[in-house]
């Protein structure tokens, strides 16, 4: 699998990956309430674990390894929602997507789009059932959100505050390379 994978999966991030990564850095200042409209979620241990899983997604060679990482991420998201809502209601994309967006922005994966493309092209029919296909679609949706986000996509943020926070985040990131 490794020999084939090395030929079909790009060694370097594609242009779309770089756009997503750049905007993730720009958005590194966000807090959950800005995406969710509420601040009652407990994210203890979620971000480090999710970041580790996104690294596993990046390093996974087979579509099955990558899908398993996504399934683990969404199990964690489901647990957060159930824990914080204290109910057993059905959890849909509207509930999980903002938390996944938050996790991806904070984790800043290097090749999110490349992983989407790889899964979309090489995932076999047995894996391509409803839930797995939805996971792959959510990667795409999150990438598009991050690339195209404006202040209007967030709760309680003015255009000026959004621009100021994004500029500060980029400046801080650039300074971290100098130090």
Regions found by a protein language model. Name each.
Residues 21-29, 82, 124-129, 144, ...:
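Short alpha-helical interface elements
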Residues 56-152:
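Alpha-helical catalytic/interaction cores of small GTPase-regulatory modules
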């Amino acid at each position: 699998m490794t020999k084939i994978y090395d030929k079909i999966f790009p060694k370097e991030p594609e242009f779309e990956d770089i756009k997503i990564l750049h905007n993730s850095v720009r958005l590194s200042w966000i807090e959950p309430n800005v995406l969710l409209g509420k601040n009652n979620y407990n994210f203890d241990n979620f971000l480090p674990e999710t970041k580790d899983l996104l690294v596993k997604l990046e390093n996974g060679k087979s579509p099955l390894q990558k899908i398993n990482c996504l399934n683990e991420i969404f199990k964690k998201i489901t647990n957060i929602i159930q824990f914080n809502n204290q109910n057993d209601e059905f959890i849909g994309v509207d509930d999980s997507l903002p938390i996944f967006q938050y996790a991806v922005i904070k984790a800043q994966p290097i090749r999110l789009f490349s992983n989407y493309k790889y899964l979309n092209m090489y995932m076999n029919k047995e894996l391509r059932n409803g839930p797995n296909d939805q996971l792959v679609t959510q990667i795409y949706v999150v990438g598009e959100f991050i690339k195209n986000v404006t202040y209007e996509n967030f709760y309680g943020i003015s255009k000026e505050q959004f621009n100021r926070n994004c500029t500060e985040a980029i400046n801080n990131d650039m300074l971290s390379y100098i130090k």
